[in-house]
Amino acid sequence: MSPRTIPLILILAAAAAHADEPVGDRTGLKLVQKYNCQQCHTIDKAHGGPSFSDIAKHYASDPNARDEVAANILNGSSGAWGPLPMPPVAVSKEDLRPLVDWILSLTTT
C-alpha cells in the first residue's frame, strides 16, 4: 500500500461520515486531493503536519486568518507546528480562497 493511501482513506472516510455537509466541504476535499495536502495533513489528526482542524482552531480568533493561512500555503512555513517545514504549494488563484475557507471552517470537528 502506498504511503499516500492511508491519509487519503482517512480523509475520504471523514468525508463520508459528514455526507450531509454542504457542497463546499466536498470542494475542499477535492482541493486537498488536487494539491496532495493529504500527504502531510488529515482532517483531525497530526500526520507530519498539523491537522486541518488544529489549524482552524489556532486561527479561530485571528481576524487575519484567511490571509495568513493563504500566505503559509503559497510561501511555505517552518517552525510554527514542529520541526518539519511546509514547502510552498503552487495553488492556483481560483483554488486558494476556497481551500483556505474550507480549512478554517473545520473548527468544530
Where are the regions that the model predicts?
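N-terminal secretory signal peptides that target proteins for export/translocation
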Residues: 1-3
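Short microdomains enriched in Cys/His and/or Lys/Arg
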Residues: 58-69
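Electrostatic cytochrome c docking/interface patches
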Residues: 16-32, 58
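Axial heme c-ligation environment in periplasmic c-type cytochrome domains
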Residues: 50-57, 74-100
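Sec-exported extracytoplasmic/periplasmic mature domains
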Residues: 33, 57-60, 74-78, 104-108
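The canonical Cys-X-X-Cys-His
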Residues: 34-43, 99
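Sec-dependent N-terminal signal peptides
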Residues: 5-14
